[in-house]
Curated annotation (Swiss-Prot):
The PMEI regions may act as autoinhibitory domains and prevent untimely PME activity during transport. The lineage of its organism: Eukaryota, Viridiplantae, Streptophyta, Embryophyta, Tracheophyta. The gene is PME26. One of its GO terms (biological process) is pectin catabolic process. This is Putative pectinesterase/pectinesterase inhibitor 26. The record marks 787 as: Transition state stabilizer. Pathway: Glycan metabolism; pectin degradation; 2-dehydro-3-deoxy-D-gluconate from pectin: step 1/5. Residues 453-614 are annotated as: Pectinesterase inhibitor 26 C.
Length: 968
């Protein structure tokens, strides 16, 4: 029997290459999301910051001798470098430059950028050279990734240099540009890390080449990190030096500012000057110089010519994907080529839109309007992204199957795309960096911040917080209202419309595809996809309805309670879509159908993620305090969530109830089976429908569908009223559908019931209970099985005084879940297996999901000799907290284990915490040393994961009057 590490859980746990791809993609966005939020906050509070800065200027326009430390240049450099992770390399690299004889922190920062640029330029060709030394195609592919990423890193650092404003020939930082600099340098740091990730993927090779490149990258990694650290601390550093930001005159700070003199240049020199701001200056000069009208010194005319170059090149390759598709019968490759054809056409439309926005003037020439610069940058950025999307589609094939890595068709298309991507990048760099407005006496918008944000700039800022900004911008911008609004709430509503429309367009696809196959396993997987798409549509629809109530009511802001709901429902939709992909990955089907469905899901996946990011990062207001002061009281509280209304709470506590339906196997009730009772439940009921199930064992599989709302089912005791099933993965049923009992409708409650899956450990995945019910409660129930016993799939769930038994990942899912006063009991698994209690499945940083185990007991169910862990991270943002619980000695001292030892330790994006646990297994001295694991340090921090806080995810929802329950 395989060890637990090799058991297929599906659900994102099978394909290691996909897992690595997800990690690379997510890491690439982590800094951008965080910094984009900072940009939004800066927009909101910009007026306050401006007042504060100028007040400081008014109070002290020039630093007094007493306010400026008497530092030598060396001491100044040492002070600035002290904020970095690599102060020694920071000091030694900058001190070698001639201009380092300065005490000005801003000049030191500029010198640090020069160090980075020089170092990156010295290694940018290294991956290509090293690739010539090997025949290992996997290694060549990794080196190609590094070459591309180092290219991008140079772009980002160049943008950082260009963004620093010009004053009397000098460059100077201001507060408004610092967020941009942080974003670009963060991206450059990420690109280094992604290159290293790519090299680590091919660690099986015996070649010394990866080590050569890693060694070659040490300096650039450190220098880029140094620049990022310096700019992140620049304001406080300048303050420490006693230099007011506006003490030195900035552009437009004085009506007497000396204009920058622009030397008269020849056409050739002008072209070189314009192209110098691009990443590919040689291709920029050579391509534009071939055009007849390139004999000009006008930067704006040269920009127009760069666009013409892009259009010509794109038109020359637009039909190539279709032609290449005729040369292959491989459906997956055809699908990727279709993606490339679509994005090429989109890029052509974008560049044509760019040209169209240039205003006609009297002599037939075109001139850029400053008001359109933001739009042009957005469009050209999207055109660059279109190229990358094609490359991603081709690279995804090679990640899954090595035969695609050197496919002649893929290589043909990649080679043909080289120029169009370079030319598009050149046009973007020119409009973003070169002051092309000075000829017309119009100040460059790069140097002038409009006090009134435009619809396009707000859309771009909002979309920058998402994982897929290009698809966010392109999808929302197609809606008419996006052209006129600067309200983030309205843009969020438009994003929901985009998501809803896209989900509706694919919701029937699994059923259609099922008609194209006779493979019963694949049909079963497609059936799961149909079900979860349905659930996702409902979740998005709930989100829209709730938001529309706020908008129609004329409220300007969403309250924290509503935002908590919206994040929960969209988190659920993200999970639902991911579950379809996971289910398709549970088996290796000899069919193009899974890839067809995955390709069709791309937009819905991205759009749902975008909507979640917007509400979580833009609309959710930061808390005024870390946590209400009553942190300790919350930890000691054993009350139910506040959405368990007093009347419902009385139902849970009552001893004598009058049910709507009574189930009795002996015929003494209204019906004999639980399913018969479920059929009697009204659809979308507003009041609680009560089902009583008398003592007995009911062998049946029960599904409480999504339209069965507010159902309360109770029995005579967890050991007396039992629902039993044996559906399992080995017998051909997908994990999602193996549950003995599943509930999807909101407001579900269960009391004094036992749910069992008797399939046994040999049958692997065999779920006893699955919950997708939002605001559901389980009181004095038991869930008994082996692998995957309790599937807390999605939405808010509360388990109180319940028993859960199992072996492998026996509490798993991506709901927002609290276990309180429960008995969690691992049992003996198969030989060579180990136990893992939890496998939490949060996919994205913005999901408010996770598992909190509070005031529980973790003890063995019988004689357990197998190694037992508290859990392992299933997904990239896995979140699990165990606090104030009793942990038995049978738990391994390490506490936690990585999903696959190949990736040990897990990424720092996971969130694993413990707090004030007791028992022999609670000793933290030998716990894992992961970046994503650490003990909680205070009651206030721990209170975030209590019932009152975690199940709503916001500081402000805790009621004044706590609803008490009997002591645990």
């Amino acid at each position: 029997m395989d060890t637990v590490k090799s058991i297929n859980k599906g659900y994102g746990k099978v394909d290691e290459t996909q897992d690595l791809a997800l990690k690379r993609k997510t890491r690439k966005r982590l800094y951008q999301i965080g910094i984009s939020v900072a940009v939004l906050v800066a927009i909101i509070i910009s007026s306050t910051v401006t007042i504060a800065i100028h007040s400081r200027k008014g109070n002290s326009p020039h630093p007094t001798p007493s306010s400026v430390p008497e530092l030598t240049p060396a001491a100044s450099l040492k002070t600035v470098c002290s904020v970095t992770n690599y102060p020694v390399s920071c000091f030694s690299s900058i001190s070698k430059l001639p201009l380092s004889n300065t005490t000005d922190p801003e000049v030191i920062f500029r010198l640090s950028l020069q160090v980075v640029i020089d170092e990156l330029n010295s290694i940018v060709e290294l991956p290509k050279k090293l690739a010539e030394e090997t025949d290992d195609e996997g290694l060549k592919s990794a080196l190609s990734v590094c070459e591309h990423l180092l290219d991008l890193a140079i772009d980002r650092v160049n943008e950082t240099v260009s963004a620093m404003e010009v004053v009397d020939g000098k460059k100077i930082l201001n507060a408004a540009t610092i967020d941009d600099l942080l974003t670009w340098l963060s991206a450059a740091v990420t690109y280094h890390g992604t290159c290293l990730d790519a090299l680590d993927e091919i660690s099986h090779t015996n070649s010394a080449i990866p080590l050569k490149l890693k060694s070659g990258m040490v300096n650039s990694t450190e220098f880029t990190s140094n620049s990022l650290a310096i700019v992140a601390k620049i304001l406080s550093t300048i303050s420490d030096f006693g230099i007011p930001i506006h003490g030195r005159r900035l552009l437009n700070s004085s009506p007497h500012a000396t204009p920058i003199s622009v030397p008269k240049l020849t056409p050739a020199a002008s072209l070189r000057n314009v192209c110098s701001v691009t990443r590919y200056p040689a291709s920029c000069v050579s391509s534009i110089s071939k055009l007849p009208s390139s004999n000009t010194t006008d930067p704006e005319a040269l920009f127009r010519l760069s666009l013409q170059v892009v259009i010509n090149e794109l038109n020359s390759i637009a039909g190539l994907p279709k032609k290449l598709a005729e040369e292959t019968d491989d459906e997956r490759l055809k699908s990727s080529l279709s993606v490339c054809g679509d994005v090429f056409n989109d890029a052509i439309d974008i560049v044509n839109d760019t040209i169209s926005t240039m205003e006609e003037v009297g002599d037939g020439k075109k001139i850029l309007k400053s008001s359109t610069i933001d739009e042009i940058q957005t469009w050209l950025s999207a055109a660059v992204t279109d190229h990358d999307t094609c490359l991603d589609a081709l690279d995804e094939l090679s990640q899954n199957k090595t035969e695609y890595a050197n496919s002649p068709i893929s290589l043909k298309l990649k080679s043909a795309m080289v120029n169009s991507r370079k030319f598009t990048s050149n046009s973007l760099a020119i409009i973003a960096k070169f002051p092309i407005h000075e000829r017309h006496g119009v100040q460059s918008p790069r140097l002038r911040k409009s006090p009134h944000p435009t619809p396009s700039s707000v859309l771009r800022t909002v979309c920058n917080v998402t994982n897929y900004p290009a698809s966010c911008i392109s999808s929302i911008s197609k809606l008419p209202l996006s052209k006129t609004t600067t309200d983030p709430k309205v843009l969020f509503r438009l994003s929901l419309q985009v998501t809803f429309d896209e989900l509706n367009s694919i919701v029937g696809l699994p059923k259609k595809l099922a008609e194209e196959t006779n493979d019963e396993g694949l049909k079963s997987a497609l059936s799961v996809c149909a079900d979860v798409f349905d659930l996702a549509v409902d979740s998005v629809n709930d989100t829209i309805s709730s938001l529309d109530e706020v908008i129609s009511g004329g409220k300007k802001n969403l309250n924290s309670s509503t935002i908590g709901d919206l994040i929960t429902w969209l988190s659920s939709a993200v999970t639902d879509i991911g579950t379809c992909g996971d289910t398709l990955d549970e088996d290796n089907y000899n069919s193009p159908i899974p890839q067809k469905l995955k390709s069709a899901m791309v937009n819905s996946t991205e759009f749902t993620s975008n909507s979640l990011a917007i509400v979580a990062q833009v609309l959710k207001k930061p808390s005024k305090s870390r946590i209400p002061v009553q942190g300790r009281r919350l930890l000691n509280s054993n009350s139910f969530p506040n959405w368990v209304r007093p009347g419902v709470r009385r139902l849970l506590q009552a001893k004598n109830l009058t049910p709507h339906v009574t189930v009795a196997a002996d015929g003494s009730g209204d019906v004999r089976t639980v399913n018969e009772a479920v059929w009697r439940v009204p659809k979308k009921g507003k009041t609680m429908f009560v089902i009583y199930v008398k003592a007995g064992t009911y062998v049946e599989n029960v599904l409480m569908k999504k339209d069965k709302w507010n159902v309360f089912i109770y029995g005579d005791g967890r050991d007396k009223t039992i629902i039993s099933g044996s559906t399992n993965m080995v017998d051909g049923v997908r994990t999602f559908n193996t549950s003995t009992f599943a509930t999807e409708g909101k407001g579900f409650m269960m009391k004094d019931m036992g749910i069992i899956n008797t399939a046994g450990p040999e049958k692997h995945q065999a779920v006893a209970f699955r919950s997708d019910s939002d605001r559901s409660v389980y009181y004095r129930c038991s869930f008994d099985g082996y692998q995957d016993t309790l599937y807390t799939h999605s939405n808010r769930q509360y388990y109180r005084n319940c028993d859960v038994t199992g072996t492998v990942d026996f509490i798993f899912g991506a709901g927002t879940v609290v276990f309180q006063g429960c008995s969690i009991r691992p049992r003996q698994p198969l030989p060579n297996q180990f136990n893992t209690i939890t496998a939490e499945g949060t996919q994205e940083a913005n999901q408010n999901t996770g598992i909190s185990i509070h005031q529980c007991t973790i003890s063995p169910n019988g004689n357990v000799t197998a190694t037992t862990y508290l859990g392992r991270p299933w997904k990239l943002f896995s979140k699990t907290v165990i606090m104030q619980s009793v942990i038995g000695s049978f738990v391994n001292p390490a506490g936690w284990i990585a999903w696959n030892s190949t990736y040990d330790p897990p990424p720092r994006t996971i969130f694993y915490r413990e707090y004030k646990n007791s028992g022999p297994g609670s000793d933290l001295s030998k716990r894992v040393k992961w970046a994503g694991y650490k003990p909680i340090s205070s009651d206030d921090e721990a209170a975030r994961f209590t019932v009152k806080y975690f199940l709503r995810g916001d500081d402000n929802w805790i009621p004044k009057a706590v609803m008490g329950m009997p002591p645990l």
